């Protein structure tokens, strides 16, 4: 943890103003320590004014007061990308809800944060790259199957320039933290690559050769949509409507029948009842292509309307980053 410590000088709802001495960056993550307890509330810098930073807190701020300390991490809000995302249910900060329930019970405690991906589960890794090859960001080093989907283990997106593959792990089972490849830069630096990548949610991924324009329709198998309101594969569409109009039902139908590899549902600002309905129905929906449960190729991110605004906003960025 960084030694950059700030002091709270004002609290207003889920916003707090923090005074700091050392440099702080926009969108940096910090942890507000609640009174004299060990509870640490995750927050993010949204504005910097001189030596004061306005921060939005992702949890209920009851008990937070002037004089409490804030630990700045020096890192931006980021999500973990790698095998283990499918079939999982996360909150807006990518905490796995089933694991949170096991640890905290029915009532989640503030300040509880878990790793998004299971560190103990082993995945079958198959190398693709060979030692001596030249690679760059987003090049494939190997593959890992998860259900019907195959993950590509890529050169980290943050790297720039050309790298030489020093070594690649042989085919076998590894967890997401084990090193599966070593890359060497032109200046001699060595980069160790694992199956998991951290990527800031508010930084666009630029490691692509070209941006493809949507040219094909996405077949939703809903006649009125495919006939009168066709959706482009790789495009965007909106379902506006009042309460009870069937927005969530249409979302379920699209998720079940659309010709896609992965389904990611972000229940952002939904009523709690609709989120519960989603969690109950998706494991029971059958994938027409495989005959197995749709949940095997689905990731759900839950942030109900009762959650703080900051957490609901973060869930949108989290969902989009995982999708990319």
Locate predicted features.
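Short, flexible, solvent-exposed loop/turn segments with mixed acidic/basic and small polar residues
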Residues: 4-7, 44, 253-254
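Switch/coupling sub-region of P-loop NTPases
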Residues: 218-324
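Intrinsically disordered, low-complexity boundary segments flanking structured domains
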Residues: 1-2, 187-188, 284-290
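Amphipathic alpha-helical transducer elements in NTP-driven molecular machines
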Residues: 2-5, 27, 39, 64, ...
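Acidic-enriched and Gly/Ser
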Residues: 11-12, 19-218
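Extreme N-terminal "head/tail" segments of very large remodeling/mechanoenzyme assemblies
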Residues: 3, 7-15
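Short hydrophobic/aromatic-rich motifs at helix boundaries and adjacent loops
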Residues: 1-3, 111-113, 198-200, 207-208, ...
């Amino acid at each position: 943890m960084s030694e950059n410590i700030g002091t709270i000088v004002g609290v207003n709802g889920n916003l707090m103003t923090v005074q700091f001495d050392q440099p702080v960056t926009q969108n940096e993550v910090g942890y507000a320590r609640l009174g004299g307890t060990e509870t640490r509330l995750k927050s993010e810098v949204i504005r910097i004014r001189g030596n004061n930073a306005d921060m939005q807190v992702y949890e209920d701020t009851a008990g937070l007061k002037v004089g409490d300390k804030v630990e700045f991490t020096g890192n931006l809000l980021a999500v973990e990308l790698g095998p283990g995302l499918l079939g999982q249910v996360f909150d807006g900060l990518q905490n796995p809800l089933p694991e949170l329930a096991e640890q905290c019970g029915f009532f989640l405690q503030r300040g509880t944060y878990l790793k998004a991906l299971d560190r103990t589960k082993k995945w079958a890794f198959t190398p693709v790259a060979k030692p001596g090859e030249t690679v760059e960001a987003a090049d494939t080093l190997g593959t890992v199957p998860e259900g019907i989907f195959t993950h590509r283990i890529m050169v980290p997106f943050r790297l720039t320039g050309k790298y030489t593959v020093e070594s690649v792990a042989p085919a076998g089972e590894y967890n997401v933290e084990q090193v599966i490849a070593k890359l060497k830069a032109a200046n001699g630096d060595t980069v160790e690559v694992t199956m998991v990548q951290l990527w800031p949610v508010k930084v666009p991924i630029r490691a692509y050769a070209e941006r493809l324009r949507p040219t094909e329709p996405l077949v939703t198998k809903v006649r009125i949509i495919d006939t009168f309101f066709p959706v482009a594969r790789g495009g965007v569409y909106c379902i506006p409507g009042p309460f009870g109009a069937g927005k969530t039902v249409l979302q379920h139908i699209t998720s079940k029948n659309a010709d896609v590899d992965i389904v990611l549902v972000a229940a952002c600002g939904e009523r709690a009842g609709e989120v519960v309905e989603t969690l109950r129905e998706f494991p029971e929906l059958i994938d027409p292509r495989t005959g197995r449960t749709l949940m095997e190729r689905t990731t759900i991110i839950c942030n109900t309307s009762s959650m703080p605004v900051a957490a609901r906003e973060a869930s949108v960025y989290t969902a989009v980053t995982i999708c990319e």
